[in-house]
Amino acid sequence: MNWIGLSLFAAVLSVEALAASPLEDPEFATRDSRNWVVMVTQPTCSFCTRLENEILQPLRASGQFEHQVRFTTVDIGAASPLVDFDGSSTTTIQFADRYQGFGTPTLLFLSPEGDVLAPPKFGVP
């Protein structure tokens, strides 16, 4: 393998490592000045996997939004416990319903306080 090929291979590996970095936990009550992008998902959603792999992972890997946006997921495959923005207990399903995250994938754009910043985006663009 020549040096150019080796360099490209190393670059791809480093981008893949960054892209595969985990999402932040949905700790909505934790104060932070960054807005949230929340993907409403469920385990059997192939379009969720596509959205994550083709759009969200590259956005996180770019580092361009690191100081502006927190990315997370809310799984509505089961009503799992979740701490809401005000510190109260809710479930993932109740949380998603409140923000009109009825189907998967749905992207929610929320302020650090839980206010809606833009209408939900349904499906894969």
Residue ranges and their predicted role:
Residues 43-47, 76-81, 114-116, 124:
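Solvent-exposed loop/turn segments at secondary-structure junctions
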Residues 98, 102-125:
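Non-catalytic, surface beta->alpha helical segment in thiol-disulfide oxidoreductase systems
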Residues 49-64:
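Typically the conserved alpha-helix immediately C-terminal to a functionally engaged Cys/Sec
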Residues 33-36, 67-70, 103-104, 112:
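Loop/turn elements at helix/coil->beta-strand transitions in domains of secreted/extracellular proteins
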Residues 64-90:
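Thiol-based oxidoreductase modules, predominantly thioredoxin-like and allied folds used
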Residues 5-16:
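Bacterial N-terminal signal peptides
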Residues 31-45:
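Short active-site neighborhood of thiol/selenol oxidoreductases, capturing the structured segment around
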Residues 20-35:
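A short beta-strand-turn-helix
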